[in-house]
Amino acid sequence: MRHGKVHRKLNRTAEHRKAMFANMAASLIKHEQIVTTLPKAKELRPIVEKLVTLGKKGGLALRRQAISELRDHDQVKKLFDALAARYKDRQGGYTRIIKAGFRYGDNAPMAVIEFVDRDVDAKGQDSGPVQEKADSEAA
């Protein structure tokens, strides 16, 4: 019987799930909107909501707790500075999930998870490490 089992396994080990959601939460905080499968979005939502609540409360111990969950110091800084200030008057409900059709390859249901009142300029900003062109051309 499945009584009392509230989270989806998503066909992954516990370590893989934890790492995946840490990466997804960091990406969501960085870009303020990501596209993923619907079950992953539904599982990610409470994780991010709790992180934003930590950011709103502030304090060194809660910042360290957020770092241990997110594993990204830059996104924790954004969480505790920008997002905490933005949602200081909102009592929960910081994210929304919008269904986005089905994926072409396997027909998986897709969804967009984004922050309510998000900064539209944050999407696509600094999308990852980029190699220096000057170093490769100088050789």
From Swiss-Prot:
Q: Name one GO molecular function term.
A: structural constituent of ribosome
* Pfam hit, one: Ribosomal_L17
Which PROSITE patterns does this entry report, sorted A to Z? RIBOSOMAL_L17
Which keywords does the record carry? Ribonucleoprotein, Ribosomal protein
**Entry keyword annotation includes Ribonucleoprotein:** yes
Query: Which Gene3D superfamilies does the UniProt record give?
Result: Ribosomal protein L17
- Could you tell me which InterPro entries the record lists for this protein? Ribosomal_bL17, Ribosomal_bL17_CS, Ribosomal_bL17_sf
Domain of life of the native organism:
Bacteria
Kindly indicate where the leader peptide sits in this chain.
none
What are the GO cellular component annotations?
cytosolic large ribosomal subunit
The answer to whether keyword Ribosomal protein applies is: yes
The biological processes this protein is annotated with in GO are: translation
Binding partners and assembly? Part of the 50S ribosomal subunit. Contacts protein L32.
Provide the family line: Belongs to the bacterial ribosomal protein bL17 family.
**Protein name, entry field:** Large ribosomal subunit protein bL17
